[in-house]
Amino acid sequence: MKVFSFTIGLVVIISLFAFALAYDEETDLMKKLVEMERAIEQRIICAPEGGPCVVGIGCCKGYSCAPGLLGLVGHCQ
């Protein structure tokens, strides 16, 4: 009975440790994504003539986005 209790306790401790590590990695990933998003927002992004245009990246002044295949990615003209 003591071996069973010890085994269950060990499994619980290892599981908690694994969840803690996974949470830390997820938190770090979210921080990196937020930093990347801020960097993109700070830059002025526009696509030149013939360049791809998608949601969030529009065409430079004087060009408009022509819809592409299935309306996913267009091109500036």
UniProtKB/Swiss-Prot annotation:
One of its GO terms (molecular function) is toxin activity. It is found in: Secreted. Disulfide bonds join 46-60, 53-65, 59-76. The keyword Phosphoprotein does not apply. GO terms for cellular component: extracellular region. Transmembrane segments: none annotated. Residues 23-43 form a propeptide. Expressed by the venom gland. Keywords: Disulfide bond, Knottin, Neurotoxin, Secreted, Signal, Toxin. Residues 1-22 form the signal peptide. Belongs to the neurotoxin 14 (magi-1) family. 05 (ICK-7) subfamily. The presence of a 'disulfide through disulfide knot' structurally defines this protein as a knottin. Intrathorax injection into crickets causes paralysis prolonged for more than 60 minutes, followed by recovery. This is U8-hexatoxin-Mg1a. It comes from Macrothele gigas (Japanese funnel web spider).
